[in-house]
């Protein structure tokens, strides 16, 4: 079965995690995000994959090659100009070659049963089948309104509360039939949610929504990335760690000469390899701080232990560690973990 992996985004909202690397190469459990997606595809029978690239596409090609190390046949389509989500898929028409195709975004972590989504699409006869997920945070996402049979009647893009009529979130994972691809204009930017899906609905085409169980999270910001790391460590997200990613029960704590009130136990250093926060020098966080309000300066690594924070003394800025006055629990609580 064929799949298209959309991996052309720059990941500007995910900075500083994506400084110096494209978003698909940002690591989760010691393995690039795109590697986890390729493994998910392979597990569910999608072994023929085309990745759409734009920003630093050469880095991604060098990292994954022909895909054989990941158990798939991997090829690439490099965009010289942004084509949007649907336009980028249309650019892969030769790869699709008139078949049904799975579309998956490089912006999310999930462990969905993609084979079940494929079967639901084939059974429905729809032009497009959309993977839906119930969410308690509907304002952050595009929503799909379905009838009792699962047929999608409308889409609502990031609504405000008065317009929230469903909690079914569009996860950005689709199965497209050839007639859906035919409806995408070639050679220009075109978007699934804003253009293709409304056009298909207006023409009377059937779009099916399949509600999937399992984990799904958009990884668009450092906070969502950090939450995803915690979920993976605590078993809510099923991922296979990289070979070099391991933790010892005897993980050492912070050196005493940092002068901080720290207690780094268990998986603290492990979590430190996953998520770096950049916080102001000389700051007092006893009242808590939001991630978006932090200035980028000193490297602070949050601990997997909820009441502990570890300073990365290997950082070039480590000599400034004593200028910090931290209430460790306040920092963790401010992240709403």
Q: Over which residues does each language-model region extend?
A:
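Well-ordered alpha-helical segments embedded in enzymatic catalytic cores
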Residues: 33-36, 88-91, 196
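Structural beta-sheet core signal
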Residues: 5, 51, 103, 128-131, ...
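Conserved beta-loop-beta/alpha segment of the NTase-like Rossmann-fold superfamily
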Residues: 60-148, 183-185
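Catalytic-core segments of class I nucleotidyltransferases/pyrophosphorylases
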Residues: 100-102, 109, 115-122, 136-138, ...
């Amino acid at each position: 079965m064929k799949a298209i992996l959309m991996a052309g985004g720059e990941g500007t909202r995910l900075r500083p995690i994506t400084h110096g690397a494209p978003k698909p190469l940002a690591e989760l459990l010691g393995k690039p995000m795109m590697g986890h997606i390729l493994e998910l595809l392979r597990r569910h029978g999608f072994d023929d994959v085309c990745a759409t690239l734009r920003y630093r596409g050469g880095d991604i090609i060098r990292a994954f090659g022909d895909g054989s190390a990941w158990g798939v046949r991997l090829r690439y389509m490099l965009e010289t100009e942004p084509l949007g989500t649907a336009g980028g898929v249309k650019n892969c028409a030769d790869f699709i070659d008139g078949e049904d195709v799975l579309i998956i975004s490089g912006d999310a972590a999930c462990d969905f049963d993609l084979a079940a989504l494929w079967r639901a699409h084939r059974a429905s006869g729809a032009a497009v089948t959309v993977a839906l997920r119930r969410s308690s945070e509907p304002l952050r996402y595009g929503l799909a309104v379905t009838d009792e049979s699962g047929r999608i009647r409308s889409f609502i893009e990031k609504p405000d509360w008065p317009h929230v009529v469903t909690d079914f979130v569009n996860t950005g994972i689709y199965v497209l039939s050839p007639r859906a691809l035919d409806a995408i204009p070639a050679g220009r930017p075109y978007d699934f949610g804003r253009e293709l899906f409304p056009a298909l609905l207006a023409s009377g085409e059937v779009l099916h929504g399949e509600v999937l169980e399992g984990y799904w999270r958009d990884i668009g910001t450092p906070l969502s990335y950090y939450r995803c790391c915690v979920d993976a460590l605590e078993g809510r997200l099923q991922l296979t760690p990289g070979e070099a990613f391991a933790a010892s029960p005897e993980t050492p704590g912070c050196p005493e000469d940092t002068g901080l009130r720290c207690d780094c136990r268990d998986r603290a250093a492990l979590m430190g390899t996953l998520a770096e926060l950049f916080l102001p020098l000389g700051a007092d966080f006893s009242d808590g701080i939001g991630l978006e309000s932090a200035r980028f300066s000193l490297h602070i690594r949050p601990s997997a232990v909820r009441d502990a924070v570890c300073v990365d003394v290997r950082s070039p800025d480590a000599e400034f560690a004593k200028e910090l006055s931290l209430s460790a629990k306040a920092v963790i609580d401010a992240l709403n973990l």
